[in-house]
Amino acid sequence: INWTGNTVYPSQLLMQRLKIDEGDPFDISLLNERINAAEDAVGNLYLDNGYLFFNANPVITQIEDDSVNIEVRINEGKQARLNRVIIEGNTKTNEHVVRRELRTQPGDLFNRSAIQRSQRELAQLGHFDPEQMGIEPININQSRGEVDLNYSLVEKPNDQLEISGGWGAG
C-alpha cells in the first residue's frame, strides 16, 4: 500500500492506523472501513484535526499473481474552523447550561471527537432525549474553511408532581 497526497501525517503513521499489513488477504470493504468508517479510521485522524474536507480514494495499481498493489490517494483539503455553534430546542433549559457542556466553541478547529464528547455530556445532563439529539455541520464554506455546527435538542419532560398527606386520629 502506497500513500499519495498526505502532507500532514507520514505514511508510516497512516499504515499503523490502517491496521492492514502487507500479505493480508485483500478485502476492499475492510480497506474502505479502515480508511473512513471505523472508530479509529484513518479519516478520523484528519477529522479530529480540522480536516473536514478530507477525502481518501484507494486505487488498485497492479495485480500480479496473488498480490495486489494499492495506492491510497489522499486529498487533505484545508482545515475548517467553527464559525457559529447553534443550539436549538432548549425551551426550558437555559442556553448557558448547554454551552458549558460543549467542547466545541466558535473559532475552534472542527474536531469529530470533541463533537462526540459534547453529545455524550449533553446526554448525561438528563435534560435531553439522546435518541433525538442531532448534531450537524451546516453552512459549510470550503473556500474559507468555515463551518457552522448545529445542535438540535429535544428536551425530556421532567415535570413532577409530588403529593403527600397524612391522617391522624386525635
What are the residue ranges of the model-derived segments?
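Periplasmic polypeptide-binding modules associated with outer-membrane biogenesis and secretion
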Residues: 1-169
